[in-house]
């Protein structure tokens, strides 16, 4: 926690009386000057260390790179320098568990939330929001180091896969037929039908994993520790073993139902329209292009931590970006439980925003039913303006998570 200086922090010799003998007085002044110089040097050193994470190339070079993409060296630096120490969460987020994730897409379009910067948390649902918001740059922040390794795996697959067919083939270790032409414009339902029947192949798995490791090490210039390698093996093997049936896992869930990857891809908005990033060639290619430009940057960080989110905000501000959308899932629920929500709000305050900057929240309908819940969904996805959030926070409106999700939210459009 930051603490404002108080009177007790003042130097006990802050006011020094004049000394009778000029020589002694001069010595005191010299000592005070030396002490001040040392203090100034110490403060400067602290500032330099704090700014090191976002210093990078000069501003003009950063903006040029952001148009054309970041170099591998700069991508690697950002992943490394913006990240905090990893933390623990009791789930394997192989996939999202939010079937309502498309319900706010029409509202995003209506508000005009597009371009700028996207910030998100969690696995593949971010790719759909990126496809809809069309940001110039994206940061994916997660407290679990394994989640960042999973995103590096995704990034490698995007680099290697020129089509949606190839993406799912690499992700699931299901080889594509060599004697059959596959249409780049095929419906996602047809693509899913093929992979629902395809069998995993151990040779493809080994070859693909080697290619993914090589891309992470050589193309992205990320050095994986032994623990990171084990995490990559675990995640990629899980996709091989479970295929399109893979789903979110939580310790102690007692076999509770979570949607499979296939079911998530098949989800529609409230008007019956498919919208996953794999639903159209155009959306897939946008997300792939952003990855290939090294502009989807995974960062290990705590929303309420002292470094990652604030450093992302500093980087965006220096680069001339404003936040278009910040997808928080239901992380804020845990921030309230852990008593650190105010620290998160202060981190949000450090982000460059406009009146169009929006939160995307996923609210579980477990302890109460949200008024905006749509039939057939256990999650309600909502929007909120970031500037409204900060105003409400300053007015003390958010004493509980329920207060947060029930105050000044933007509900999904009604299907009627």
Question: Can you say where each PLM-predicted feature lies in the sequence?
Answer:
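Mature N-terminal segment immediately following signal peptide/propeptide cleavage
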Residues: 67-110, 117
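Class I S-adenosyl-L-methionine-dependent methyltransferase module
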Residues: 136-297, 392-416
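Conserved SAM-binding loop of SAM-dependent methyltransferases across substrates and taxa
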Residues: 125-133
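Alpha-helical subdomain
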Residues: 243-416
């Amino acid at each position: 926690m930051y603490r404002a200086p108080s009177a007790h922090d003042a130097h006990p010799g802050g006011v020094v009386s004049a000394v009778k003998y000029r020589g002694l007085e001069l010595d005191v002044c010299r000592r005070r000057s030396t002490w001040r110089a040392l203090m100034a040097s110490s403060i400067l050193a602290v500032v330099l260390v704090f700014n090191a994470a976002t210093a990078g190339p000069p501003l003009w070079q950063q903006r040029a790179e952001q148009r054309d993409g970041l170099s591998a060296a700069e991508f690697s630096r950002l992943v490394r320098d913006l990240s905090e120490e990893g933390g623990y969460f009791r789930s394997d987020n192989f996939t999202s568990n939010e079937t309502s994730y498309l319900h706010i897409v029409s509202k995003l379009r209506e508000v005009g939330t597009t371009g700028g910067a996207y910030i998100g948390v969690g696995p593949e649902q971010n790719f759909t929001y990126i496809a809809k918001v069309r940001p110039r740059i994206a940061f994916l922040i997660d407290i679990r180091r394994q989640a960042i390794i999973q995103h590096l795996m995704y990034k490698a697959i995007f680099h290697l896969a020129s089509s949606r067919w190839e993406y799912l083939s690499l992700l699931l270790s299901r080889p594509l037929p060599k004697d059959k032409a596959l249409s780049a414009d095929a419906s996602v339902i047809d693509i899913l039908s093929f992979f629902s029947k395809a069998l995993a192949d151990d040779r493809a798995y080994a070859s693909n994993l080697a290619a993914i490791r090589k891309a992470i090490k050589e193309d992205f210039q990320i050095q994986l520790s032994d623990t990171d390698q084990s995490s990559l093996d675990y995640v990629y093997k899980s996709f091989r073993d479970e295929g399109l049936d893979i789903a979110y896992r939580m310790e102690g869930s007692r076999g509770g139902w979570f949607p499979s990857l296939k079911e998530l891809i098949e989800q529609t908005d409230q008007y019956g329209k498919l919208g996953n990033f794999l639903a159209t060639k155009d959306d897939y290619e946008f997300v792939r292009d952003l990855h290939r430009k090294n502009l989807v940057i995974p960062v290990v960080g705590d929303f309420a931590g002292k470094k990652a989110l604030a450093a992302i905000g500093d980087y965006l501000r220096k680069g001339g970006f404003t936040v278009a959308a910040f997808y928080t899932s239901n992380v804020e629920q845990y921030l309230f439980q852990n008593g650190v929500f105010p620290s998160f709000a202060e981190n949000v305050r450090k982000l460059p925003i406009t009146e169009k900057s929006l939160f995307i929240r996923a609210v579980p309908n477990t302890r109460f039913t949200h008024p905006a819940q749509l039939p057939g969904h256990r999650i309600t996805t909502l929007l909120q303006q970031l500037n409204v959030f900060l105003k409400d926070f300053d007015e003390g409106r958010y004493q509980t998570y329920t207060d947060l999700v029930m105050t000044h939210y933007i509900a999904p459009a009604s299907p009627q």
